[in-house]
């Protein structure tokens, strides 16, 4: 899959570093996800009043909505250290044991993509989360014996885009489950304005709204689009970001007013023009546009469904009447019979 301007995953190391500079450090600075903020504030204050580690927290939802940011905020609000790792990087039980053994009382351990840890590693997590201990097997064969090592109380914050892929025993060990949803226009506009202030760029209110509109409900994409519009403004408009420059830049980037790019259009057109709007199987669509099935399912499909452009049925994927309207394709009802 080629890098997309509307990809809600981080693209490269440079973008990782730049995003870190934009992240808030306190709940009061965090924009959006209001119910989550309110609940977390109560849970954190209660844990501090009892002088206990915060219950383990599971953050789930689409990429780019602030799960890593929230994990860091939790650590800041608790005034403790945070250790950051990811599911794929914990290959063996010993890797996890080493990380857990390095934690101090109250620390936060953040595991991104926690759904990707192996079942063998998961087994080590169970007693660590439940009883704050490690069960280590020493020796081999008949001489093998289990040794229990006590751990200081800690908070595990797990993040995933695929909560359904977590095993039930692991999921049930999280005391706090928080789902992050796509952002509304008001909160996204606030984020674009704040980022513009950080970058010290001049931008009008219409441009803020236009960038927010095309950001797929995702702060990471909003910030990325602002950076690219800033590039166009710097080269072609003396650094001024007005609505004319913004519209021109976003159109050149092939991001429409639904936040769809050329690949989204390609998917919808394949369903409509080649398969009469569906239903059509995901494998068939993948072959038609030259993408992998898992990429379609995880990256492209969720937003198209969320925008009401695509339906997932038992017989396959179906383009909705809204997809026809958006692409200016005549909708003939007989096609669907």
Swiss-Prot record:
Any keyword Coiled coil? no
Question: What residue spans carry the region label Head domain (RuvB-H)?
Answer: 257-337
Would the keyword rRNA-binding be found if you checked this record's keyword annotation? no
What domain of life?
Bacteria
Binding-site positions, DNA: 293, 312, 317
Give a GO molecular function annotation for the protein: ATP binding
GO cellular component terms given for this protein: cytoplasm; Holliday junction resolvase complex
Stretches for region Large ATPase domain (RuvB-L)? 1-183
Taken from the record, one Pfam family name reads RuvB_C
Gene3D superfamilies from the UniProt entry: 1.10.8.60, P-loop containing nucleotide triphosphate hydrolases (3.40.50.300), Winged helix-like DNA-binding domain superfamily/Winged helix DNA-binding domain (1.10.10.10)
For the ligand (ATP), the binding residues are 22-23, 64, 67-69, 130-132, 173, 183, 220
Q: What is its EC number?
A: 3.6.4.-
Subcellular location(s) per record: Cytoplasm
Q: Where is this region: Small ATPAse domain (RuvB-S)?
A: 184-254
Biological process GO annotation list? DNA recombination; DNA repair
Which cystines does this chain contain?
none
Q: Which reaction does it catalyse?
A: ATP + H2O = ADP + phosphate + H(+)
Detail which positions bind Mg(2+).
68
Query: Which InterPro entries does the protein's record reference?
Result: AAA+_ATPase, AAA_lid_4, DNA_helicase_Holl-junc_RuvB, P-loop_NTPase, RuvB-like_N, RuvB_C, WH-like_DNA-bd_sf, WH_DNA-bd_sf
State its role. Answer: The RuvA-RuvB-RuvC complex processes Holliday junction (HJ) DNA during genetic recombination and DNA repair, while the RuvA-RuvB complex plays an important role in the rescue of blocked DNA replication forks via replication fork reversal (RFR). RuvA specifically binds to HJ cruciform DNA, conferring on it an open structure. The RuvB hexamer acts as an ATP-dependent pump, pulling dsDNA into and through the RuvAB complex. RuvB forms 2 homohexamers on either side of HJ DNA bound by 1 or 2 RuvA tetramers; 4 subunits per hexamer contact DNA at a time.
Similarity field? Belongs to the RuvB family.
Classification via PANTHER family: HOLLIDAY JUNCTION BRANCH MIGRATION COMPLEX SUBUNIT RUVB (PTHR42848:SF1), PTHR42848
Subunit organization: Homohexamer. Forms an RuvA(8)-RuvB(12)-Holliday junction (HJ) complex. HJ DNA is sandwiched between 2 RuvA tetramers; dsDNA enters through RuvA and exits via RuvB. An RuvB hexamer assembles on each DNA strand where it exits the tetramer. Each RuvB hexamer is contacted by two RuvA subunits (via domain III) on 2 adjacent RuvB subunits; this complex drives branch migration. In the full resolvosome a probable DNA-RuvA(4)-RuvB(12)-RuvC(2) complex forms which resolves the HJ.
Name-wise, this protein is Holliday junction branch migration complex subunit RuvB
Origin organism of this chain? Macrococcus caseolyticus (strain JCSC5402) (Macrococcoides caseolyticum)
Identify the gene encoding this protein: ruvB
